[in-house]
Amino acid sequence: MATRIDCDERRPTVQTRVWIDEHDWLHGIFKSPHNTSPKFRFPDLLSACVSLAFRDSANQARLITYVLTQLSLRDPKTERRSCDIWAPQFELLLDAHRGPWNSFPNSKFDIDAIATACVAVSRLSGDAVASVLRQVRANFRARCSTGNSPLN
C-alpha cells in the first residue's frame, strides 16, 4: 500500500539525466580553477543552467527553439549520465515538460532532453562558465535565505 510522502522527508535534490556532451561540459566547469571556495557540485551546476534557461521569456524561447531544432536532430540513443538537480529547478523542468509546446499534438520530449537543452543553451551564451558560476552563487544564496542552508 502506498503511503503519503511527508514533505519534511523530501530530498532536497532529484535525480535526472543529462546527455553525455553536456554532462562533460558540466564536468569541465566542476574541475575548472574558477570553481573554488566553495567548490560547487553537479546539482549546483545543472540547477544554474536550468535557472538561466528559464530566467526570462527570451531565454525560454531560445530553449524551446533549441529542443525543437537542434536536440531533435541528435541520436535519441545518445549516452546519458545521472545528475542530481535541486528541487526548485526540477520543478521548472516539470513545468516545461507539461508545457503546451511539449503536449499533444506536438512531439513529446523527456525531462532529460529538456535538462540537456538547458545546459546546451547556457553553453552557447557569451562567457558561459562565468555566467553559470554567477547563477550558482545566486541560487546558493537564495537557498540559504529561505532556510534551506547546508546547516539545516
Explain the meaning of each model-derived region.
Residues K31-H34, P100-F104:
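Short, recurring structural edge motifs at helix starts
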Residues V14-F54:
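Short, highly charged
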Residues S37-T65, N106-N139:
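Short, basic amphipathic alpha-helical segments that act as recognition/interaction helices
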Residues M1-K31, T65-H97, F140-N152:
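Short Lys/Arg-rich basic patches
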